A protein has these predicted regions:
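Structural motif corresponding to the intra-repeat A-B loop/turn of tetratricopeptide repeats
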Residues: 505, 543, 588, 630-631
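Short, glycine-/aromatic-enriched active-site segment of Class I SAM-dependent methyltransferases
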Residues: 133-155, 347-367
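A short glycine-rich, Lys/Arg-flanked "PGG" loop and its adjoining helix->strand segment in the class I
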Residues: 119-133, 329-341
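A short beta-strand submotif of the Rossmann-like class I SAM-dependent methyltransferase core
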Residues: 106-109, 315-321
Length: 704
């Protein structure tokens, strides 16, 4: 029983003129969307709802939301707007059964409780929640210096949340998507309040209290049940890895420990599956109990993944492991073996944690890393000469990115802020050399490497392609041309590593070199060649190259046009390359050549590939019209009218080549179809501008 009469206190509080009708956040809709970003849809209870601003915002978003508050005056006012959605109740004894709501929200309420009541309230929030608890709590005193009875920092509040339910079936842990709400770096600057985004633990966790976990904390810890910035750092690495997981990916969490990272990878991505392996049977038992609904866990040595087939894993995450093993090179070679062509490997290691004696004081660390050593091991794992490892497209593993990470609170850089940032590159876009790395404070190194999609001296791959991204409702390749990469490409793995935006290699020089290698070895009448050429054309648009090289690329567009082929994807690249050539000619100042390229782009029937390809032909029509409107308005109108009619024509065609499967439309299909309409709308606006192209060309252009 609390010693504070909260009902009398807050009935009076809400009747004050400066408090009546107020809310603790300026934008209730923004807060509602934050809740939805973490919790998704489902029923929501707002505890300490006040006048109901958040509940009303959630209702407007289509969420089944209700509110409860200790103060009748606030509840009466809220029910006047949404009758029956609010009721009087105490956070210390909520009037709802266990698991009554998918998500329980509590904003700016807990700090108003006496410290002795905090854990009781947290247990109640967890009890009535089925899945999620979303808390915002102030960490500073209120303006009147009387209402905030518990003023503590984030770490204290997190620990209370993690321990409040011990001995019950209502334990809480961090939500795996918590860093998607308040990012790792943003936690340094949260201001006067902090957000705790929590998830209900499985009932089996009752057998695993934190005290039991703390006994092995030096080697294993569930960072979703650990407060503080060091735990934030561990979770941030997995969120970083999640950002490059492609839809449909098979993910391996190597040396997964207690499995929290596997859970983050599964809940923060559209990957198809996550497999966590660890050599410790006890760790795997915990992982299965805690996170078995998200991922599959097996006891296995990451240096011997013989049960994992070659070319079967799309992403391997291996964090804080290489320094623990006697043969890190052997482990890295296993990762390369199991990765698919174009698959990614993400590893992290402590960056030179040696003390004054030159030794790492952590007894479990067998290796000491700096960038030079990590780089060399990655290159050797990819086949480079161990005596003189050097980056090369002939290697099987290419280094794509390098990040540094700081957390603060450790042996070194104790006062550092939370940071994950790319390490500097030089003007040639080469990754930093060791002397430069030393000038940037670093606690951990995070490297991203990509497995080559090419066999040696070839544009092909040794692995059989499997489609996991662009599938229909049954998981098969949909009918039509759009996703027929295995049918049409010499090496369909290039789609992921070279072609698809948001999936392909992110380092410009590496992408450029891959495209050049493909053009060197692929047949000129293949979509592989055409796609590589398109990559280089757009690269030249954003990063101008030597004039002779640009001229060579433009000449290749014409050469490709003479190659005989009925391959639909070859047509796709011919249209795209003529359009890109027009843009490049414009940038180079050769407007006559640009008009000729755009004209050639519009000469193809895009329906032999897909209605979506009309984004190129219609924009080409629009650009052609704009280029000649001042001197030949009638000719410009013909181009714009042709653009409008092209949209009408292609959208009347069979939509199998527009979206694949209407039960599971391809993810890019309807957004690109909307671009067809948008571009046609620009042509229509240009037509309607009429004589304004002569009398007020700036106004005419603004209309489009």
């Amino acid at each position: 029983m609390s010693s504070v009469d909260y009902q009398s206190l807050y009935n009076t509080y809400w009747q004050r003129p400066d408090r009546f009708g107020s809310s603790s956040f300026a934008d209730a809709t923004a807060m509602a969307r934050r809740v939805m970003k973490v919790a998704g849809a489902g029923s929501v209870l707002d505890v300490g709802c006040g006048f109901g601003a958040l509940v009303h915002a959630l209702l407007r978003e289509g969420i089944d939301a209700r509110g409860v508050d200790i103060a009748p005056v606030a509840i009466d006012h809220a029910n006047a707007t949404s009758p029956g959605r609010f009721q009087v109740g105490s956070i210390l004894a909520l009037p709802f059964p266990d698991g009554a709501f998918d998500t329980v929200v509590c904003t700016d309420c807990l700090e108003h409780l006496a410290e002795s009541d905090v854990q009781v309230a947290l247990r109640e929030l967890a009890r009535v929640a089925r899945k999620n608890v979303f808390i915002v709590v102030s960490t500073v005193q209120d303006r009147d210096h009387q209402w905030h009875l518990t003023v503590r920092d984030r770490d204290w509040w997190e620990l209370q949340a993690f321990t409040a339910g011990e001995g019950t079936d209502h334990l809480l842990r961090r939500h795996p998507r918590s860093l998607l709400d308040v990012s790792y770096e943003a936690r340094e600057h949260e201001g006067p309040s902090v957000t705790l985004t929590l998830e209900k633990c499985p009932i089996a966790m009752r057998e695993w209290p934190r005290e039991r976990l703390l006994k092995d904390r030096g080697l294993h810890m569930d960072m979703l049940r650990e407060p503080g910035r060091r735990a934030d750092a561990h979770l941030a690495r997995y969120v970083h890895a999640a950002s490059v997981v492609r839809p449909g990916d098979s993910v391996l969490d190597a040396s997964c420990g207690l499995g929290y990272g596997s859970h983050v990878l599964r809940q923060c991505t559209s990957g198809a599956s996550v497999l966590g392996v660890d050599i410790d049977p006890q760790a795997v038992a915990y992982a299965q109990a805690a996170y078995g609904e998200s991922a599959r866990f097996e006891v296995a040595d990451a240096t011997d993944l013989s049960r994992v087939a070659d070319h079967s894993i799309d992403l391997v995450a291996c964090f804080e492991t290489l320094e623990h093993v006697s043969e890190p090179e052997k482990m890295l070679r296993e990762f390369v073996r199991v990765l698919t062509p174009g698959g990614r490997l993400l590893v992290s290691v402590p960056h030179d944690w040696t003390d004054e004696s030159g030794h790492d004081p952590n007894p479990h660390h067998l290796q000491v890393y700096d960038w030079a050593r990590l780089r060399a091991q990655l290159l050797v794992a990819g086949g480079a000469d161990a005596a003189k490892p050097a980056p090369s497209l002939d290697n099987t593993l290419w280094i794509e990115q390098l990040h540094r990470q700081l957390a603060g609170g450790g042996m070194k850089h104790a006062s550092a802020a939370r940071v994950i940032a790319p390490l500097a590159v030089n003007v040639q876009d080469e990754l930093v050399e060791p002397d430069l790395a030393k000038s940037q404070p670093t606690e951990w190194l995070l490297a991203t490497a990509i497995k080559s999609p090419l066999a040696p001296n070839s544009a092909c791959s040794p692995a059989t392609y499997r489609e996991t991204i662009f599938t229909d409702a049954s998981g098969s390749v949909p009918a039509g041309n759009l996703a027929s990469f295995k049918r049409d490409y010499e090496n369909p793995w290039l789609l992921r590593s070279m072609i698809a935006l948001g999936m392909r290699i992110t380092r410009p020089t590496l992408l450029r070199e891959l495209a050049r290698r493909v053009m060197q070895y692929a047949p000129a009448n293949s979509p592989d060649f055409g796609g590589a050429l398109c990559v280089l054309l757009y690269d030249a648009l954003t990063t101008p190259q030597a004039a002779a090289f640009e001229s060579e690329l433009l000449g290749r567009v014409s050469t490709l046009d003479t190659q005989m082929s009925r391959n639909p994807h070859v047509l796709r690249w011919r249209v795209s390359n003529w359009f890109a050539a027009g843009l490049l000619h414009q940038r180079r100042g050769d407007l006559a050549a640009a008009r000729a390229a755009f004209d050639r782009c519009t000469a193809y029937d895009v329906l032999a590939f897909s209605p979506l390809l009309a984004t190129k032909t219609i924009e080409a029509r629009f650009r052609l019209g704009c280029m000649i409107a001042g001197e030949d308005l009638a000719g410009a109108k013909r181009h714009w009218h042709a653009g409008v009619l092209e949209a009408q024509r292609v959208l009347q065609a069979d939509w199998v080549n527009l979206w694949g499967d209407d039960q599971a439309p391809l993810p890019f299909a309807l957004p690109e179809a909307s671009q067809v309409i948008d571009l046609a709308a620009r042509c229509a606006a240009a037509l309607r501008a009429g004589e304004a192209w002569r009398s007020s060309p700036a106004h005419a252009l603004a209309m489009t």
